[in-house]
């Protein structure tokens, strides 16, 4: 099913999304990769606040290239999500609900998604220039020393994504693999 949604990703909205849905996302998202996630989780462990309010937030696993003159951002394709798996349950426990990336997730992340009504969106790897066209504003908000991995606040319009894992733990990757194997056996 095709859905056009406006953030923030509330629990109610998350529960309307199902593995396999095509989603066009509009609203504010945040960028972070493994170094940024590590730093945020360290801050949380010390009782410190995060650089943004994580409640109902969606985090895009991306390290964008520098913007060319006249552009908001450079190429902004997804990075492999597995590198954030050690941190994703902690981020969801403080309110983050959406994650955008590519690739499979560990069972612990899927369990956290079920517990906290999280959604994992897949973005097309190799389509960073196309995805960058959906980004209308970009603002560096923290950890500038991390370069491309610094935290940014982005405003996106109609960002094309697929729900890979929904809040019930349904997993498009696993469903697709099972369907393929079933056909192969016939």
Report each predicted region and the residues it spans.
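Feature captures the catalytic cores and cofactor-binding loops of soluble hydro-lyases/lyases
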Residues: 31-32, 36-159
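A broadly conserved detector of short glycine/acidic/proline-rich loop/turn motifs that flank catalytic sites
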Residues: 9, 29, 64-66, 158, ...
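C-terminal binding/interaction regions
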Residues: 25, 133-186
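Short, structured beta-strand/loop micro-motifs enriched in basic residues and often containing a Trp
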Residues: 1-9
């Amino acid at each position: 099913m095709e859905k056009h949604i406006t953030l923030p990703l509330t629990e109610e909205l998350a529960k309307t999304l199902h593995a396999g849905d095509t989603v066009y996302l509009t609203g504010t998202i945040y960028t972070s990769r493994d170094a940024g996630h590590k730093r945020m989780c360290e801050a949380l462990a010390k009782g410190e606040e995060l650089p943004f309010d994580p409640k109902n937030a969606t985090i895009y696993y991306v390290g964008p290239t520098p913007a060319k003159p006249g552009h908001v951002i450079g190429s902004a394709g997804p990075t492999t999500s597995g590198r954030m798996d050690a941190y994703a349950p902690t981020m969801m426990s403080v309110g983050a609900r959406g994650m955008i990336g590519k690739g499979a997730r560990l069972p612990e992340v899927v369990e956290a998604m079920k517990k906290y009504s999280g959604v994992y969106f897949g973005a097309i790897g190799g389509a960073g220039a196309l995805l960058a066209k959906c980004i209308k504003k970009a603002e560096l908000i923290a950890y500038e020393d991390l370069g491309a991995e610094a935290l940014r606040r982005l405003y996106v319009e109609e960002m094309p994504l697929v729900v890979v894992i929904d809040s019930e733990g349904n997993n498009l990757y696993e469903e697709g693999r099972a369907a393929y194997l079933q056909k192969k056996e016939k």
